[in-house]
From Swiss-Prot:
Homotetramer. This is Diglucosylglycerate octanoyltransferase. The gene is octT. Belongs to the OctT acyltransferase family. It comes from Mycolicibacterium hassiacum (strain DSM 44199 / CIP 105218 / JCM 12690 / 3849). GO terms for biological process: protein tetramerization. The lineage of its organism: Bacteria, Bacillati, Actinomycetota, Actinomycetes, Mycobacteriales.
Length: 240
């Protein structure tokens, strides 16, 4: 990293780059990764997509050339996922993600509409999108692979956020099990955690976030950034 600014390597779901009105470019200064990087005087490599779970982070870390390029100059790595892992999913993730590939288009639209109708009705009795033990397993696989290539690099992870989304029937009964699994994994491997619920609950649960009931406003992004900076300092990153 000599002669170059360190990079904050962030693996995330859409919570990290959505604001109160929708998705934002990765360089928007109001989202928490850029607030954190600005305070550190670092660059950011933001790798994520809507709906990503910890399994997707594993795939990204091992298959995305942006991650390969960023890791040698990374000053720290953040796993900002877990929210989608803990959300209820009436269909197994593999089947749900196949909807986009259905042909012809008219049939795809009908299937998507049907799923959109079923999801809020079945979510209260559905299992997590990713079983908690798999969340922990994929996080450790990713952490281990990163540590193999960059021994001792500071790693921070997150506990799931909260939501009041009607699209999920406002159900989030899987959060606690996912949070426990992540907490135990972090304890075993010395990973510092940020509790996203603690940062954003006041904004989200009181209806001050995105109207979808899942994503955040910029006050929540600022609160997350503050907790991330504290966690990075605890993990050994010198903060200004």
């Amino acid at each position: 990293m000599s002669g170059r600014r360190p990079t904050l390597l962030v693996f995330c779901d859409s919570l990290s780059y959505y604001g109160p009105r929708g998705g934002l470019p990765a360089d928007d200064p109001r989202i928490w990764p850029n607030i954190v990087a600005s305070q550190l005087d670092w660059d950011v490599e933001l790798i994520g997509r809507v709906g990503w779970t910890s399994r997707d982070v594993w795939w990204a870390a091992t298959q995305d050339p942006r991650a390969w390029a960023a890791l040698p100059r990374a000053g720290a790595v953040i796993f900002a996922t877990g929210g989608m892992d803990s959300l209820p999913s009436p269909l197994p993730t593999a089947l749900r993600e196949l909807i986009r590939y259905i042909r012809p288009p008219w049939l795809r639209r009908r299937v998507r509409d049907l799923y959109g109708w079923l999801q809020p009705r079945l979510s209260p009795v559905s299992r997590n999108a990713l079983p908690p033990h798999l969340t922990a397993e994929y996080l450790e696989m990713t952490r281990g692979a990163i540590d193999f290539n960059r021994p001792g690099i500071p790693v921070v992870a997150a506990l799931p956020s909260v939501h009041i989304a009607d699209s999920y029937g406002r159900a989030h009964h899987g959060r606690e099990a996912t949070a426990r699994a992540i907490t135990e994994w972090a304890r075993q491997h010395g990973v510092v955690l940020v509790d996203l619920k603690a940062a954003v609950a006041d904004q989200v649960l009181n209806g001050r976030g995105n109207p979808d009931g899942i994503h955040w406003n910029f006050e929540a992004h600022q609160a997350v950034a503050e907790l991330m900076l504290k966690a990075l300092a605890e993990a050994g990153v010198p903060c200004r």
